[in-house]
UniProtKB/Swiss-Prot annotation:
Protein name as catalogued: Pyridoxine 5'-phosphate synthase
Species for this entry: Prochlorococcus marinus (strain MIT 9211)
Recorded superkingdom: Bacteria
Enzyme class, spelled out: transferase
Pathway: Cofactor biosynthesis; pyridoxine 5'-phosphate biosynthesis; pyridoxine 5'-phosphate from D-erythrose 4-phosphate: step 5/5
Residues where 3-amino-2-oxopropyl phosphate binds: 7, 18, 191, 212-213
Length: 243
């Protein structure tokens, strides 16, 4: 049964749209935990477009569940992670031009740089995950550089037409099986919604799903605590015959 990590970046997006003091991500993280979140995920981007450094520090000091920091593979971000000490760091690709993360990290051609970062994080007892596309070579490279976890990018599945979703789902299933056979832990996320999450949640071996935008959107109608509760129900009790 997968657990649920709630990404609260979009709470900060609303605040930063007016450079205001509300909504407060820390308060919303508390409500997410009340709704059943097993962890809180934030992406501290280099351009600080939503989550700010102070948010990360306050979350580390206040949340009762796990803190997962998504970050680019840069010296600045590694230094911040070593100071804040989140429970997990997920290394993601990052481009200032993108609206959101557009794909998995290129591990194969950046193994030495990533290996050094992972070693530094592990020395501080910070678990490290690599956000990758469901591609065999990227999984193998993630294992080779010492990552303990991978997070499978589900964006292609989420954006696929109904006819092609099953093909993308099969890729994710195969990648999960491959990663587990190598001794890697597996998370998944990106683009998942209340309508498409169950087939992913039903995949054997996926330990956590990180979901944000759809929960924040649903919260406008039912409140954040209820929105998280609804998603938690789908993640922990998925129907297994969606396809």
């Amino acid at each position: 049964m997968a657990s649920l990590g709630v990404n609260i970046d979009h709470i900060a997006n609303v605040r930063q749209a007016r450079l205001a003091s509300e909504p407060e991500p820390v308060q919303m993280a508390f409500l997410a935990e009340l709704g059943g979140a097993d962890g809180i995920t934030v992406h501290l981007r280099e351009d600080r477009r939503h989550i700010q450094d102070k948010d990360l520090k306050l979350l580390r000091a206040t949340i009762n569940t796990r803190l997962n920091l998504e970050m680019a593979a840069t010296k600045e971000m590694v230094e911040i992670a070593l100071q804040v000490k989140p429970d997990m760091v997920t290394i993601v690709p990052e481009s200032r031009e993108e609206i959101t993360t557009e794909g998995g990290l290129e591990v194969v051609n950046n193994k030495e740089k990533l290996r050094e970062i992972i070693n530094n994080l592990h020395s501080a007892k910070i678990q490290t995950s690599i956000f990758i596309d469901p591609i065999e070579a990227q999984i193998k490279a993630s294992k080779e550089i010492g990552a303990g976890w991978v997070e499978i990018h589900t964006g292609c599945y989420a954006n696929a037409s109904w006819e092609k979703q099953e093909i993308e789902l099969a890729k994710i299933k195969a990648s999960c099986a491959q990663a587990r056979s190598m001794g890697l832990h597996v998370n998944a996320g990106h683009g998942l919604t209340y309508l498409n999450v169950e087939p992913i949640a039903a995949i054997e071996g996926i330990e956590e799903l990180n979901i944000g935008h759809t929960i924040v959107a649903r919260a406008l109608a039912v409140g954040l605590q209820n929105a998280v509760k609804e998603m938690k129900s789908l993640v922990t009790n998925p129907r297994r015959n969606n396809f």
